[in-house]
């Protein structure tokens, strides 16, 4: 089973969905996640369990009860909160827990004392003795070939400061091609303001009502 604690469908959630979808060809997979993101997950089993605080004994008990009832022997936790919960599950059961670090953290305490840790970047695994580096995958069918698709250039991602969409917009001043930014997030308002400020409304659009499968 895969455990996600967030209530929005962003990069981590998409990664988990694609991973579980592929792994379901070999074994049964289920994603434990917030009900708010169920609509984004197709063709993979999913269930919603109220998690709340990562330290709540009641919430931990709910999750543990579900795992035992469904005879789940391996819990793959994604992110710091899910990994903290997984670590507590490991303390009180024989369920194996694997954590994946998806981004830089101030400290790696949530990922300590689990059975195995996966990092998509070698630097993320510093100080973790049982860490394994597995880089993010890509579809090698593209082989670096230029797309034959007609239409605007697409940039897809969650609209957060760390993604650098503001730099992308600023770089578009001298580019004639049209750009569609597909995503949603807290930076949407400021990015729209930046597009207006640079008078790029005719070149750049932000599309928020587009789910994973339609992309």
Residue spans of the language-model regions?
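Conserved donor-binding/catalytic core segment of Leloir-type glycosyltransferases
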Residues: 1, 145-163, 169-176, 180
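N-terminal strand-loop element at the rim of the active site
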Residues: 2-61, 66, 187
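Short donor-sugar binding/catalytic loops of nucleotide-sugar-dependent glycosyltransferases
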Residues: 5-8, 156-165, 185-186, 210
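Glycosyltransferase donor-sugar binding loop
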Residues: 32-37, 156, 178-191, 208-209
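Donor nucleotide-sugar binding/catalytic pocket of nucleotide-sugar-dependent glycosyltransferases
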Residues: 47, 113-143
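Short His-centered aromatic/hydrophobic patch
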Residues: 56, 77-83, 101
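Nucleotide-activated donor-binding/catalytic signature segment of Leloir-type glycosyltransferases, i.e.
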Residues: 192-210
């Amino acid at each position: 089973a895969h455990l996600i604690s967030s209530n929005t469908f962003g990069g981590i959630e998409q990664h988990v969905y694609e991973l579980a979808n592929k792994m379901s060809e070999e074994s049964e997979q289920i994603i434990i996640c917030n009900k708010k993101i169920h609509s984004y997950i197709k063709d993979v089993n999913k269930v919603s369990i109220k998690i709340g605080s990562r330290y709540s004994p009641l919430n931990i008990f709910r999750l543990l009860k579900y795992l035992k009832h469904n005879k789940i022997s391996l819990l793959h936790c994604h992110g710091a909160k899910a990994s903290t919960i997984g670590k507590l599950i490991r303390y009180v059961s024989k369920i194996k827990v694997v954590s994946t670090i998806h981004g830089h953290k101030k400290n790696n305490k949530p990922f300590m004392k689990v059975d195995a840790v996966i990092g998509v970047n070698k630097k993320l695994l510093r100080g973790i003795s049982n860490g394994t580096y597995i880089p993010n995958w890509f579809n090698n069918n593209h082989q670096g070939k230029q797309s034959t698709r007609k239409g605007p250039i697409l940039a897809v991602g969650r609209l957060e400061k760390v993604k650098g969409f503001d730099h992308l917009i600023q770089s578009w001043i001298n580019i004639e091609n049209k750009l569609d930014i597909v995503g949603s997030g807290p930076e949407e308002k400021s990015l729209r303001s930046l597009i207006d400020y640079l008078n790029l409304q005719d070149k750049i659009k932000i599309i928020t009502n587009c789910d994973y499968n339609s992309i």
